[in-house]
Amino acid sequence: GPMYLRFTRDAIPQIYDEDAEFVIGKANQLKEGKDVAIIANGDTVRLALDAAKELEAKGITARVLDMHTVKPLDTEAVTACINEIGKVITVEDHNILNGLGSAVCEVAAEMGKGVVKRIGVQDQYGQSAPYERLLAMNGITVENIVKTAEELQ
């Protein structure tokens, strides 16, 4: 079926072992937590994991999911985050409209509960800059994830 791949020019840290398995439509839970869920994909997964470490030092535990497949979305994993935690942050290096954040918001809306905060590119024209600078310009940072999680507590 249809698919797309996105690549950055910069080298990114390796999160998975070479023998890691991925199932289309099934998120990979990388960390357990009970205070907030952080759902990310692509390179932003490393930011989510780094934010979870910082949050843990502040007494806030974060469940981190790598939602490597946006369509089909792992609605079971999203539903579990909303039912068990109720507070979700999505992180993506993509427009917050019609991406991971929107898909998670649709699940929460159908359920009629939960709070979802989206971190990503706002609905604006893109800019040109080095990758890390673009992330910072759009608030896609460890600091912003931590701040957002703290505001949800």
Where are these regions (language model features)?
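Divalent-metal (often Zn2+) His-rich catalytic cores of metallo-beta-lactamase-fold enzymes
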Residues: 5
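Thiamine diphosphate
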Residues: 8-153
